Amino acid sequence: MTSACLVDRLEHWWEAHQARVAPVTTLVLHLDNGPESHSHRTQFMARLVAFVQRARVSVRLAYDPPYHSTDNPIERCGGILETHWNGALLDALEAVCGFTAAMTWKDGHPLVEVVTTTYATGVTLTKEARAAVEARVARLPSLDKWCVDIPYAPGDLWDA
């Protein structure tokens, strides 16, 4: 999964839920500091800055420190899914989607959508673009890579 895919999924979620969460002024994204969502990943941060301006909502990135994979909620969910399909042959997209939609995690069923977009890898920004992104980001001095704010700036015509 690329950083562009992560932001596309966030944008998709925001469009679907914006009316319900309209009073919200800041989204807090709880992230695991993986390679695609790292706060120094320039493409990820540029896409988030652009999202903030389009959505007119601030974003706070709250990262977990390194930990064992069994402590990661997403990986626990993956383990539950593996138990649910119990060695079944996943030879068709319909089988994968069916098992995933039917699993139960935290008393609910996941929303399953197939993403068919092909994302480029190795996307980089120019030095000037990186500086423009970093100028829009507020890092807490003692928590530089663990807590990052991207404030919405009314009237800013950011275009990344």
Segments predicted by a language model, with ranges:
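C-terminal accessory extensions appended to soluble enzyme cores
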Residues: G87-A160
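Two-metal-ion acidic nuclease core segments, chiefly of the RNase H-like superfamily
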Residues: F44-A62
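Alpha-helical scaffold elements adjacent to nucleotide-binding pockets in ATP/GTP-utilizing enzyme cores
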Residues: R9, Q43-L48, R76-L81
